[in-house]
Amino acid sequence: MTQDEMKKAAGWAALKYVEKGSIVGVGTGSTVNHFIDALGTMSEEIKGAVSSSVASTEKLEALGIKIFDCNEVASLDIYVDGADEINADREMIKGGGAALTREKIVAAIADKFICIVDGTKAVDVLGTFPLPVEVIPMARSYVARQLVKLGGDPCYREGVITDNGNVILDVYGMKITNPKQLEDQINGIPGVVTVGLFAHRGADVVITGTPEGAKIEE
């Protein structure tokens, strides 16, 4: 089974959590694209979706799924999204696709966060995957200096502007032994919009695509 087939297995397995008549929170990325394909088979049965990115919105609309603005809904039953890394405590690094801020907002209003990944994303300690930080452009250099003080090696993601009009710093060399503390520290730097650490709001359900199929941990 290829990596993409494992992603597909995870994405389609998440469909069991979708309730008829509900509005579904939808993330961003290659694994989520498989979930969106699956959700398309229920387009007549759900009310619609709240999307975390322009890319996912376009894909959902192409399948006839109505898009709701985040401000139109008080809460969501579920939010389905992938991760770049996930540890045993279900804390994650996300934001490789630069949609971290909107992903964090949609995750915050969801009752249940369902993380869909392939087996390569599970790690003992977060930080091998570079940690994305969304930054207001004028604060880029200042934030980078503060990230160095925290032990990181920040790298400006050239040519990338987020859906919110900001830039991304990818922080290398972080061995993240206390994700919640680091999330607070980085979010406290003036000019940071948010960091791609999902520690305070981790996953409630993890669906992992494996060569044997989807493995669900609730």
Curated annotation (Swiss-Prot):
<feature type="binding site">
    <location>
        <begin position="28"/>
        <end position="31"/>
    </location>
    <ligand>
        <name>substrate</name>
    </ligand>
</feature>
<comment type="function">
    <text>Catalyzes the reversible conversion of ribose-5-phosphate to ribulose 5-phosphate.</text>
</comment>
<dbReference type="InterPro" id="IPR037171">
    <property type="entry name" value="NagB/RpiA_transferase-like"/>
</dbReference>
<dbReference type="InterPro" id="IPR004788">
    <property type="entry name" value="Ribose5P_isomerase_type_A"/>
</dbReference>
<feature type="binding site">
    <location>
        <position position="121"/>
    </location>
    <ligand>
        <name>substrate</name>
    </ligand>
</feature>
<comment type="subunit">
    <text>Homodimer.</text>
</comment>
<keyword id="KW-0413">Isomerase</keyword>
<dbReference type="GO" id="GO:0005829">
    <property type="term" value="C:cytosol"/>
</dbReference>
<dbReference type="GO" id="GO:0004751">
    <property type="term" value="F:ribose-5-phosphate isomerase activity"/>
</dbReference>
<feature type="binding site">
    <location>
        <begin position="94"/>
        <end position="97"/>
    </location>
    <ligand>
        <name>substrate</name>
    </ligand>
</feature>
<feature type="active site" description="Proton acceptor">
    <location>
        <position position="103"/>
    </location>
</feature>
<comment type="similarity">
    <text>Belongs to the ribose 5-phosphate isomerase family.</text>
</comment>
<dbReference type="Pfam" id="PF06026">
    <property type="entry name" value="Rib_5-P_isom_A"/>
</dbReference>
<protein>
    <recommendedName>
        <fullName>Ribose-5-phosphate isomerase A</fullName>
        <ecNumber>5.3.1.6</ecNumber>
    </recommendedName>
</protein>
<dbReference type="GO" id="GO:0009052">
    <property type="term" value="P:pentose-phosphate shunt, non-oxidative branch"/>
</dbReference>
<feature type="binding site">
    <location>
        <begin position="81"/>
        <end position="84"/>
    </location>
    <ligand>
        <name>substrate</name>
    </ligand>
</feature>
<comment type="pathway">
    <text>Carbohydrate degradation; pentose phosphate pathway; D-ribose 5-phosphate from D-ribulose 5-phosphate (non-oxidative stage): step 1/1.</text>
</comment>
<dbReference type="GO" id="GO:0006014">
    <property type="term" value="P:D-ribose metabolic process"/>
</dbReference>
<dbReference type="InterPro" id="IPR020672">
    <property type="entry name" value="Ribose5P_isomerase_typA_subgr"/>
</dbReference>
